[in-house]
Amino acid sequence: MPKRVNFSRHLEKHWLDQVAIWSSQGIGKAELNANIERMLEHHVQCKVNRGKTRNQLMGIWFDASTVDEAWHNNAIGFVQQSENVPFILHWGMLIAKNYFFADVVRFIGRKSKHYDCFTYGQAQKYIAELYGDTETVKRSLRSVLKTLVDFEIILREKSGSYKPQVMGYEIEKKYKNWLVISLMQNRGTSSRSVLDLLDDLVWFPFSFTLSVNEIDQSLFELHQQGNNLVLFRK
């Protein structure tokens, strides 16, 4: 997996909701770009930064060039079927398409197992080991943290530290196989044990369970390897 830093601007949930809805309506790239530009006009004053934010939003909910197209279309279908855009769809898209975002989330998930809070310095040290100690990496880390504050996945404390929020949000059955593929795409693999999939720290805010009966066998083959049940994408 390439260690690409691709989160230069923070995102807000209501922006993602709106872009997901527009994408589900089948509008073209030029029109979607124009819609996002108008939406961001009063939120992001700098034209250059507005363009970066727009490109990130397009990359998540419009551009399917880096992921499985059928998987991407399934997400669009879920949006079309929903009165409100389920937050878990944004999460799955971000995990599959943005490795940097996923690595920051894993750091927070690891910290949340042992500590109530973490500092920016701790996060920066960990991410610098993966991506390098550059201003681009630091800026992108700040953008991810600001995004997660907006998502209410972490809280910014008065001390300047961050407190992870374990929401315990139960994931609906219809999204589980789609999320499994999200994680496989993030990991760049077509097979993984069920235990590893469920234990991945990207799910730390949620309650993600997966029984054998919930596995879509039109998407996966199941193999028992020792004590592990392994899923292979078809």
Question: Model-predicted segments: where are they?
Answer:
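Positively charged, polyanion-binding regions of nucleic-acid-associated proteins
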Residues: 14-23, 90-116, 171-192
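Eukaryotic partner-binding/assembly regions in large regulatory complexes
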Residues: 1-95, 106-107, 118
